[in-house]
């Protein structure tokens, strides 16, 4: 568990996904056995850590299962009960097997697994890739096969593997050591008759540094090994000092940097939902849920379930938002626009609908008109039906939708696209994921990276052929000529200079120069491995090279 890592961006964010084509070859989907069917949509359920930390016992989990089965959470899709750290004895048994703490779990974990399964839940557990867990209990290093078999024999089908107490062995960097250990676990799980869902915490141990290269590198391999990855800081625990809202926003910002990795079978994990945290307002709790749902992020509640209010149960079981979260396309909502106050995000859904999510980060109520063109809807004379996913009310819109949001509130609309108006061009910010600066089009055909300001000049369309053009000047296209990057007429004969590809490393590569877009003075340079100035976020819907 990583706590206290500083927020890496106050303004930046990023992501991508799949639907149009910015490249020729789609990126292969992996799971812990190279099968996205193992976890095609993000997990939903309960974990004790953020609410109770090491104060866990058998009664907590039986009471949680009983309540979730009765209050609608299980039936809404929250079907996993997961233990976190501190469940085990301080010593392994004589044969090296892990043992549960018999005081905390007098009936044993196999008994508890049967109990929660009888209530309609899956059962998950926590371990660590080091020699000790974060809480000082036995880690799985050099016991991987034995522990995997133990967990399976207990009826467990989900493993959260933390990364405390991992040290580089001779001849390896720390990143290489983590890759070896998590890769070995992947091999162990792949050989099992019924592989466990594999939640990897490795990226969290590389987040929040001055140089993101190792963090990006770890993010490159976690989708190959498992189904979800805890990528950054821990969400603030119930008893922790500091602002719970700031903690949510910190993890939200981290998640926006990583959308290019997510697809069916692998999900970015910005950590638990904390709906009973006393430091959150009602709007902040609802925003936390709505943003995670829009991301198609794991919805794992860490709260005292029996004491949740009716209002908290109501938003946690919102069918329309859960349907977005569980949408089989598994796109992450990405930034269409951003300024100091509003984040506007969008994504596509499997049936062709378009999602609009708007977050008010400011401290006062905000009213704003949002053009449908910012959402990737470019056809004229169209009327769309927009459903408010909080209350189910619908409205007809044509060129814009009007939003009024209280401080720290989030609006979510699902737009139905009528026949003849159903084409979508991936649209949104192109921004550097280290600095958070947005690519900005100027009227003199120049481009620059500037602080994100919500202007149309920072919103870009990405066409199926790999052409990138600003919404403010749709007849102009981003082009490279030698080291120079500029806007030029889209009908230029220099077609290769206007074609870009986007690999999973986050580079924007130009077909003519074979170089990479580089922040700074905005120029083309040789492509370097996961260099901060060359890693960018693009709109959802752009397919990876």
Curated annotation (Swiss-Prot):
Q: What class of enzyme is it?
A: hydrolase
Give the signal peptide range.
1-31
The SS bond pairs are 54-86, 134-164, 438-452, 477-490
Q: Which sites carry carbohydrate?
A: 57, 95, 101, 131, 211, 363, 444
State the InterPro entries in the record.
Answer: Aldolase_TIM, Glyco_hydro_27, Glyco_hydro_27/36_CS, Glyco_hydro_b, Glycoside_hydrolase_SF, Melibiase_C, Ricin_B-like_lectins, Ricin_B_lectin
- Where in or outside the cell is it found? Secreted
Protein EC: 3.2.1.22
Active-site residues per Swiss-Prot or TrEMBL entry: 162, 220
User: What's an example Gene Ontology biological process for this entry?
Assistant: carbohydrate metabolic process
| Inducers of expression | Expressed on galactose and galactosecontaining oligosaccharides (lactose, melibiose, raffinose, and stachyose) and polysaccharides (pectin, xylan, gum arabic, gum karaya, and locust bean gum).
Modification comment: A C-terminal Ser/Thr-rich region may provide possible sites for O-glycosylation.
What single Pfam family name could you report for this chain, choosing any that match?
Ricin_B_lectin
| Boundaries of every Ricin B-type lectin domain copy | 421-518
According to the UniProt entry, its GO molecular function terms are: alpha-galactosidase activity; carbohydrate binding
Look up the domain of life of the source: Eukaryota
Q: What does this protein do?
A: Hydrolyzes a variety of simple alpha-D-galactoside as well as more complex molecules such as oligosaccharides and polysaccharides.
The record's comment on protein family reads: Belongs to the glycosyl hydrolase 27 family.
Protein name, as recorded: Alpha-galactosidase A
Q: Which organism is it from?
A: Aspergillus niger
Record lineage: Eukaryota, Fungi, Dikarya, Ascomycota, Pezizomycotina
